[in-house]
């Protein structure tokens, strides 16, 4: 829990410090192709048919996004969100690959809401992976620090219904995964 508090404080501080100066020097202009990536803290939760409560696991998370600008308020693109951790000597990964929309309520500001749908995955090292329907949503703020570059603090949530997962040779029926993510991204507009 300490890691979440520290990362949240750093992200909030970066957003506060950079917002005022960046707004005056580099206006929020969104047009054409955009691309970005980022890293941060993630918390994975699992549920399954007939399972008792499964504890959340904290780990490293990241994302990659790219797409095109539809208007000064709407961006459309594709993104990949991932989470990973070594648990008891086994590498566990979860992720989403989505078609996503980014909505900026006020075009002159950097605040945005995002949502997407696509595919989710879950895999434990040495086992076959599970893939199913996935959703993602979140919010963030593009802190413009250059003409075409922003630091982008984000808070995201992704969910997936990955079906039957495999753990240590055992089939886990009806597995659903979700990841909460807090991170810092780098975006080129």
Predicted regions and their residues:
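Cleavable N-terminal export/targeting peptides
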Residues: 1-29
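Short glycine/proline- and aromatic-enriched beta-strand/turn motifs that initiate or cap beta-hairpins
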Residues: 23-85, 163, 177-189
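Residues that define the transmembrane beta-barrel architecture of outer-membrane proteins
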Residues: 31-33, 56-62, 91-97, 109, ...
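Residues on the lipid-exposed face of transmembrane beta-strands in outer-membrane beta-barrel proteins
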Residues: 37-41, 62-68, 99-103, 117-119, ...
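Transmembrane beta-strands of outer-membrane beta-barrel pores
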Residues: 39-45, 80-86, 93, 117-123, ...
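Extracellular loop and loop/strand-boundary signature of outer-membrane beta-barrel proteins
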Residues: 49-53, 85-88, 121-128, 167-173
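Repeated loop/turn-to-beta-strand initiation elements of outer-membrane beta-barrel proteins
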Residues: 72-76, 108-113, 146-151
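Helix-adjacent hinge/juxtasegments
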Residues: 89-122
């Amino acid at each position: 829990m300490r890691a979440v508090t520290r990362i949240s404080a750093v992200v909030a501080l970066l957003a506060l410090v950079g917002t005022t100066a960046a707004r005056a020097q580099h206006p929020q202009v969104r047009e054409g192709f955009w691309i970005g990536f980022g890293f941060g803290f993630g918390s994975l939760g699992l549920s399954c048919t007939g399972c008792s409560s499964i504890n959340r696991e904290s780990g490293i998370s990241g994302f990659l996004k790219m797409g095109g600008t539809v208007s000064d308020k709407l961006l459309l693109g594709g993104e990949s969100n991932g989470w990973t951790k070594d648990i008891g000597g086994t590498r566990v990964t979860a992720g989403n690959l989505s078609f996503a929309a980014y909505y900026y309520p006020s075009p002159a500001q950097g605040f945005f809401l995002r949502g997407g749908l696509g595919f989710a995955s879950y895999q434990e090292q040495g086992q076959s992976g599970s893939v199913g329907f996935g959703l993602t949503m979140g919010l963030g703020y593009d802190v413009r620090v250059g003409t075409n570059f922003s630091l982008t603090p984000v808070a995201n949530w992704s969910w997936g219904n990955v079906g039957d997962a495999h753990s240590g040779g055992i089939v886990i029926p009806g597995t659903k995964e979700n990841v909460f993510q807090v991170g810092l991204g780098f975006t080129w507009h």
